[in-house]
Amino acid sequence: MNTVNETGPHKGRYLFTVFETGQSGVQRIDLLTGETETIWQGPAPGSHVAFDASYWTPWGSFITAEESWTTAAAGATSPYGRLFELKNPTTARGITLPLTASSNHDADFAHQTVVPRVSHEGIQFDQQGSMYFIDELNGGNVYKFTSAAKWGEIMSGRANYFDAGQTFVLRVGSGSVPNATGTFTWVPFTDANGVGLNGALTITDVNGVSSVDGRNTTNLAAFKGTDYQRPEDLQLQTVAGRQYLYMATTTTNEVYRIDLQRNLITVFADRATIDLATGAAAGAALSSPDNLAIDHDGNIYIIEDRNGGVDDDIWFARDLNMDGDLADAGEGLARWASNGTTGSEFTGLYFDPTDKRRAWVNIQHPASGNDRTIEITIR
């Protein structure tokens, strides 16, 4: 995925993306000079894997996380499922190859162990400072982390957001019905310091690092979260001061809308949604929604995970009255872009927050082996 430095000195100058590989890393593109640098990379194959999220925090750091975790009733011991914070993303010097023991020494890059282990993808922060994340799994859940630190102290640099905090899982009803919609509650499974509540699964991984196991804890009856089918990306939208969280689920071909004020989850888009090009239901034309994006006007975009050489599209969701459904006259889905690169998929569509006429998208794992970051401009 992609993000720019949304705050601080040189705001909007740098574009960041990550390597979703078996030796993950973080790349920075200087949009002023065109220089591209890797500013952090896993020191060895398998040490850090499947970085997916790219998110600029409100206090000016960069976070990413691993899309890799294990289902195990007693708790997993995988070294992965971690969330990392790069605290000096604009000033860390680019590394040179070959990698050595000192290659990453200029990057202040930390595993934030207070965040439970899951297979991470989408990450978003609301206006109150809560962080939302998912577990990318058939049967995965939606989570909220709330820092114990005061927001003003975090923003001024006097406190660390990830020093302590509480994590919750979203539950509709008893949590027993998968893909449920309706009123939900946030069920805590750690205390305010991030320590697992009684019965939660705290694991020590093969590297000797301890964390709460988010996935396997929220499969337990006491902490059961509502299961969704491969929840992937998240996107926050603000309408008239109210905050809504959108979530794509790849297996069920749906996008959900989570009303954070009313604690209500509904379906925003699915295969029954009108394709504005035909006037009929989108049907199988909408498949495997993966990433989400939002433009300056608050419109939601849905990015598919399909075969780029055949049928991989980005859909524009036309919600004229911003009421969270696409059922009103003139509303529906329209293809905004189509991929044409064999073996690839679109990923990481991101609209420049400083220029409403510019966006970026990645072409990931093409058959040629040549990944690309593409800039899209409207003039």
Language-model features: locations:
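Sequence/structural signature of beta-propeller domains
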Residues: 1-379
